[in-house]
């Protein structure tokens, strides 16, 4: 199998110790623009009908598989998963091409990406998922997979090709997109993570079919893209100092432990948590649940060469999903800013290296001087590269 790959730098770059840009987010009005919930005990929300924005392919557009003379041909679908530390953000992020912030107006490069995909013959769906204070992990993962099943089950209504669905997202959305790509319908066989869980328990943990309205449909996607996504929540704490940045998130919001149930390493006993040592736990969440989440919430574990798996597909895709040297792993494009002080770029480099070792089609684009969520990660050149990569990897031929 041919492996795609580009590094927009000489090898894997390193950066000098850099002043931590904790003010970057505050100056941009990041915290003013989002109302962050006050965390106490969780306020669970049962998954019902998720919210989505749907953008059909532009009339007369063409892709690598269809031409402008075939307007009725089903379109490939890009499912976009918003970011926001798993605790805020919205499916409306792709609507307006002008972004209005407390500091003024600027182009919404994510919406411009959506428009470029439409013009290239893709349909685009931007979805919501439950926040971490509404559903502990893997609730958000279940919601994204349910969205894939929903669109696949309603292929005729939306005019999409169910064999050509890709998923992509930024930051927290990139983390979820990578997990969707590399755990989809895999658990009916052996465990992706090599744990001792039974196949049914493992399957339900990653798929959430018990609460699904479309349990007979596959959650597998043909390809994926991650923009500055987290691939290993355990090492992000050490990656930041290695990259020359402070240990914690700006305005430390505890995004990781609030998502998974506790800090890492997981405290031995919820009743003896030592806050002075930085230990935290979400009220009402048992330590055993947090331990399981910390064992399974990392995309890197699903793609490492030593975790070679025979991923079983529910749908017999005629695309890049075929079994082969990759062990069935899903093609993935990664985009990351080298100056990202929130999620260091090493988080994407490791996934890229693991996929290359397994001969899985993959591309890594490292953006010089770009911060977390930087609009330069969605430049027209990168969007075109993303289109080319996804067109190749979701091809139905």
Locate predicted features.
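Alpha/beta-hydrolase superfamily serine-hydrolase fold, recognizing
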Residues: 2-149, 153-397
């Amino acid at each position: 199998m041919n492996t795609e790959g580009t590094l927009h730098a000489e090898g894997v770059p390193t950066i000098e110790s850099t002043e931590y840009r904790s003010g970057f987010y505050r100056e941009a009005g990041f915290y003013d623009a989002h109302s962050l919930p006050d965390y106490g005990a969780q306020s669970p929300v049962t998954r019902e009908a998720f919210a989505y924005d749907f953008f059909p392919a532009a009339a007369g557009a063409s892709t690598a598989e269809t031409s402008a003379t075939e307007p009725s041909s089903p379109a490939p679908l890009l499912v976009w998963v918003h970011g926001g530390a798993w605790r805020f953000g919205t499916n409306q992020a792709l609507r307006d091409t002008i972004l209005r912030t407390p500091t003024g107006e600027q182009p919404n490069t994510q919406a411009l990406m959506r428009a470029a995909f439409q013009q290239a013959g893709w349909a685009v769906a931007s979805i919501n998922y439950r926040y971490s204070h509404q559903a502990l992990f893997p609730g958000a993962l279940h919601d994204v997979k349910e969205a894939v099943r929903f669109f696949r089950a309603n292929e005729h209504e939306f005019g999409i090709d169910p064999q050509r669905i890709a998923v992509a997202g930024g930051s927290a959305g990139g983390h979820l997109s990578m997990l969707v790509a590399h755990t989809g319908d895999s658990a009916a066989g052996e465990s992706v993570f090599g744990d001792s869980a039974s196949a049914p328990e493992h399957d339900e943990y990653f798929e959430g079919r018990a609460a699904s309205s479309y349990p007979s449909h596959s959650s597998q996607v043909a390809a994926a893209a991650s923009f500055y996504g987290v691939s290993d929540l355990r090492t992000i704490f050490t990656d930041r100092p290695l990259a020359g940045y402070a240990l914690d998130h700006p305005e430390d919001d505890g995004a990781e432990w609030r998502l998974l149930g506790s800090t890492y390493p997981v405290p031995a006993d919820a009743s003896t948590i030592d806050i002075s040592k930085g230990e935290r736990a979400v009220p009402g969440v048992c330590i055993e649940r947090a331990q399981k989440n910390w064992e399974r919430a990392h995309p890197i574990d699903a793609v490492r060469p030593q975790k070679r798996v025979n991923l079983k597909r529910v749908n017999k895709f005629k695309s890049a999903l075929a079994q082969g040297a990759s062990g069935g792993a899903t093609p993935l494009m990664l985009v990351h800013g080298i100056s990202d002080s929130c999620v260091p770029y090493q988080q994407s480099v490791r996934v890229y290296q693991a996929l290359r070792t397994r001969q899985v089609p993959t591309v890594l684009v490292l953006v010089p001087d770009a911060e977390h969520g930087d609009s330069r990660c969605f430049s027209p050149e990168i969007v075109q590269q993303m289109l080319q990569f996804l067109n190749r990897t979701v091809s139905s031929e």
